[in-house]
């Protein structure tokens, strides 16, 4: 046997010692081979990273932490030929950004609803002021622009109309303003078909000063139009007023109101005095809040009188630097009108005003 041949060079070794030597030699050889293999793989990996950067994608749930530490790079984003990265498991996925969501990514509270209240008129009566004032109330959300749905855009449908509205909570009122509704023949029926419970707000003003204000606004946009006197009369010497001119026709409030009373009871229509809105804004807004069935949140503390513009403005909120006042287009200086023309128009409007007072049960004292 071999140990006898080897044993010639020295005394024989015990069997146990030979086994330990064999095991140690084998272990040392395996360790060397493994180390060489790992070094080789590491070198190949480094060369691949230097040649073409690649990123690990789509880690499994069990390996996310490990890959997060060893991930070689962050991709700039998928190319047109490259599929998007798969979404993370549902439990770890962030909430999707929805249309109309806030900056934090969570959906805005509330629902878009059809308006429960409308400011339907009248043009140049003070409707913008009422809208801006009532928007201060926490229980009212109002559309800032005039959608003209019931006069110009009715064919777009109620779903389109609803999509324009601000989101509201169950306890809030949705409101919009379009002054031309009051003189639109089809508007009362269309609003009734939307909801017979709709509350209507009408801001009225002395029809003569309203017509002059209307003309002043038009003149600022079209300086070449005829004079106010020329547009107001078909024959001034005979005192024949041209009721086809819209600035005159709008002020015939009793005539337009008849169309509304065919569909809505007087209790659902609230009339605001444009004159009192200037002299006592808190009082007029208090009555509007009562009509809408909401708390009297807007009071005297919310207003101050702007002497330059000649009407009240909202006091500045704590979060802003400047007071909230209507824009430059509001509070224009009216054009000078011949006093005789004003007297003729007052006489023309007198029977309409009296009938209007009797119908609504209020005396606006325009005579």
Swiss-Prot record:
The scientific name of the source species is Rattus norvegicus (Rat)
Its keywords, alphabetically, are: Disulfide bond, Glycoprotein, Golgi apparatus, Membrane, Signal-anchor, Transferase, Transmembrane, Transmembrane helix
- Pro residues bias (residue ranges): 73-83
InterPro entries recorded for this chain? Answer: NST/OST (IPR037359), P-loop_NTPase (IPR027417), Sulfotransferase_dom (IPR000863)
Tissue distribution of the protein: Highly expressed in the brain, in the pineal gland specifically during the daylight hours, and weakly in the olfactory bulb and pineal gland during the night. First detected between postnatal days 5 and 10.
Name of the protein described by the UniProt record: Heparan sulfate glucosamine 3-O-sulfotransferase 2
State the EC number(s). Answer: 2.8.2.29
Gene coding for it: Hs3st2
Recorded catalytic reaction(s): these are: alpha-D-glucosaminyl-[heparan sulfate](n) + 3'-phosphoadenylyl sulfate = 3-sulfo-alpha-D-glucosaminyl-[heparan sulfate](n) + adenosine 3',5'-bisphosphate + H(+)
